[in-house]
Regions:
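A metal-dependent, Asp-based hydrolase signature
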Residues: 1-21
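Surface-exposed cleft-lining segments at the edges of enzyme active sites
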Residues: 22-29
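Transmembrane alpha-helical core positions of polytopic small-molecule transporters
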Residues: 29-30, 86
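A short, well-structured juxtamembrane/interface segment
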Residues: 31-38
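Asp-based, Mg2+/Mn2+-dependent phosphohydrolase catalytic module
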Residues: 41-44, 48, 53, 57-58, ...
Length: 163
């Protein structure tokens, strides 16, 4: 909400309350990409734990997961609200390591955002970048460990990795 207000003010865009509310509602009502539910189910069948680490608020995250029909597929949902620091600050990624009680090298951080992937990689997490648009890798000083076109190949990629 604050980011939307800041961006519209900075760009000198007049935005009505109705348009603002409609834009914010878009974050609460999302549809997953077609392969996401089945991929999450396969990962669960492999005994994998799935978690979300987001700059979003707990309310936004739970509403979005519910609208997407994905809430039951995530065992852990972490919001930066708990530490009042945003990604890509290292404290955020440490929060995930602590909450999951798993060493960084045994996690896989998956993101479609280059800056988010770079922050996680700089922290020391293995990273898969989901590059649905075939965009060039951003020049952020670190690169993802693997680049995926979508999530459908993730279970096969992980079969050789320990749980």
């Amino acid at each position: 909400m604050d980011a939307l207000d800041f961006a519209t003010e900075r760009l000198g865009l007049g935005i009505s309350t109705a348009d603002r509310d409609r834009a914010l509602q878009g974050w609460l009502e999302v549809r997953p990409y077609p392969e996401v539910p089945s991929t999450l189910d396969v990962l669960a069948g492999q005994g994998r734990r799935c978690a979300i680490l987001s700059n979003g608020s707990p309310y936004m995250l739970h509403a979005a997961l519910a609208s997407a029909g994905l809430a039951r597929r995530f065992q852990t949902v972490l919001s930066v609200d708990a530490i009042r620091t945003f990604k890509p600050h290292p404290r955020v990624y440490q929060m995930a390591v602590d909450a999951l009680a798993t060493p960084p090298g045994e996690l896989l951080f998956i993101s479609s955002n280059g800056w988010d992937a770079a922050g996680a990689r700089a922290f020391g997490l293995p990273v898969a970048w989901v590059n649905r648009t075939r965009a060039p890798v951003e020049r952020l000083g670190v690169s993802p460990d693997v680049i995926l076109a979508d999530l459908s190949t993730l279970p096969a990629l992980l079969t050789a990795k320990p749980r």
